[in-house]
């Protein structure tokens, strides 16, 4: 998981997902297969989840689209080419668009 997302919401995501897996009695069998960024949003691959667990992950996918990938602050820009959300302070030089024009 990129540092900014880990800082911005990573712990909260894990706590919510853990509570759901404990509620469903699946915590001991649950395995995370991969966590990454793709097209500017969170991708989380696992060994199987509950419907409510997938709802939690979908919520954080949406949050990731508007969270700076570097620092965890609210994103204001999306870079072109390699699509990633950034705040004004972290946005690299080069082409980018305001986030509200992208989504």
Where are these regions (language model features)?
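Long, charged N-terminal interaction/targeting segments
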Residues: 1-54
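Cysteine-rich micro-motifs
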Residues: 81-93
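Short functional micro-motifs and their immediate structural scaffolds
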Residues: 73-78, 92-95
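Peripheral peptide segments
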Residues: 30, 50, 62, 75-77
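Basic, amphipathic alpha-helical/coil surface patches used to engage anionic, phosphate-bearing ligands
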Residues: 95-103
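Short, flexible, mixed-charge glycine/proline-rich loop motifs
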Residues: 36, 55-66, 77-81
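Short cysteine-rich clusters marking metal-coordination/redox-active sites
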Residues: 68-71, 87
């Amino acid at each position: 998981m990129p540092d900014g997302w880990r800082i911005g919401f990573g712990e909260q995501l894990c706590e919510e997902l853990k509570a759901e897996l404990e509620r469903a009695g699946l915590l001991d069998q649950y395995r995370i297969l991969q966590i990454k960024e793709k097209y500017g949003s969170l991708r989380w691959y696992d060994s199987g989840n509950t419907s409510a667990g997938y709802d939690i992950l979908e919520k954080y996918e949406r949050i990731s689209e508007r969270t700076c990938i570097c620092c965890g602050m609210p994103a204001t820009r999306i870079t072109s080419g390699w699509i990633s959300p950034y705040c004004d302070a972290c946005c690299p030089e080069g082409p980018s668009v305001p986030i509200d024009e992208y989504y």
